[in-house]
Design a protein with these regions (language model features):
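Long, low-complexity, intrinsically disordered polar/charged segments
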Residues: 1, 17, 55-69
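Conserved pre-motif I regulatory segment
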Residues: 1-39
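Helical mechanochemical/support elements of P-loop NTPase systems and associated helical scaffolds
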Residues: 3, 15-18, 22, 50, ...
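Conserved nucleic-acid-binding Ia/Ib motif block in the N-terminal RecA-like helicase ATPase lobe
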Residues: 4, 8-9, 63-94
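Hydrophobic transmembrane signal anchors and adjacent membrane-proximal interface regions, especially
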Residues: 12-13, 36-37, 51, 70, ...
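Walker A/P-loop NTP-binding motif
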Residues: 24-36, 47-62, 83-87
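The conserved Walker
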Residues: 40-44
C-alpha cells in the first residue's frame, strides 16, 4: 500500500474528512525543510500536522528507531502516543 493511500486511511481512522489549511501547509513545509515552528491555538490540529509528515518520512525497511519526539510533559507525550495509535499505522510507538 502506498503512503498516499495509507494517509487517506489515517484520516478515516481519525474520523477526519480533510486536513485544515494549517495542517496542509505544515505538512508541505515539514517535508521540505529541516526547521519548522508551528504556532496555532489548542485543538487546531498541530499534533496531526506534524505526525503525518513523520509517517511519510518513515522507511519500513529500517527496523531501528527512526524518530524521537521530545515534549515538555508526560501528559502531552501520552496524548501524542494516543493520536499515533489511532492513526493505525504499522509502526510501533512507545
Amino acid at each position: 500500500m502506498n503512503k498516499k493511500h495509507h494517509s487517506n486511511n489515517i484520516l478515516l481512522n481519525l474520523g477526519i474528512e480533510s486536513l485544515n489549511e494549517m495542517q496542509e501547509v505544515a505538512q508541505d513545509v515539514i517535508l521540505n525543510d529541516n526547521n519548522v515552528l508551528l504556532l496555532s491555538p489548542t485543538g487546531s490540529g498541530k499534533t496531526l500536522a506534524f505526525l503525518l509528515p513523520i509517517f511519510e518520512m518513515l522507511q519500513p525497511e529500517i527496523l531501528s528507531v527512526q524518530c524521537l519526539i521530545l515534549v515538555p510533559s508526560r501528559e502531552l507525550g501520552l496524548q501524542i502516543e494516543q493520536v499515533w495509535k489511532k492513526m493505525g499505522t504499522d509502526y510501533k510507538v512507545n
